[in-house]
């Protein structure tokens, strides 16, 4: 099972491009775990809207009650993943379409 884990914080400017690069992979992950670290912009609602339009993946979306910072938020997100193989990515990454396949 392949999981992708994303930690977000105020990433409204880039998050859609990152999510598109995940759903366009030649090998689709079994799940995508996204944990938002108390964004004060529209990141969370943008992700919710994206998920509604792209339901072919098992999405797991969470929002922290308090800001943990990037390192603790990634640890938190990884703990929620169920995959044997876990890819981590930042909210402003854009993946090559064959990233999962090549890895």
Language-model segments: which ranges?
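Nucleotide-sugar donor-binding/catalytic module of glycosyltransferases
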Residues: 1-103
């Amino acid at each position: 099972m392949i999981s992708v884990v994303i930690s977000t914080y105020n990433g409204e400017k880039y998050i859609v491009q990152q999510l598109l690069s995940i759903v366009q992979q030649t090998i689709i992950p079994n799940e995508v775990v996204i944990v938002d670290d108390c964004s004060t912009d529209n990141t969370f609602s943008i992700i919710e809207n994206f998920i509604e339009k792209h339901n072919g993946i098992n999405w797991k979306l969470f929002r922290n009650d308090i800001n943990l910072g990037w390192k603790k938020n990634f640890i938190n997100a990884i703990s929620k993943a169920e995959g044997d193989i876990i890819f981590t990515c930042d909210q402003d990454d854009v993946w090559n379409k064959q990233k999962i396949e090549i890895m």
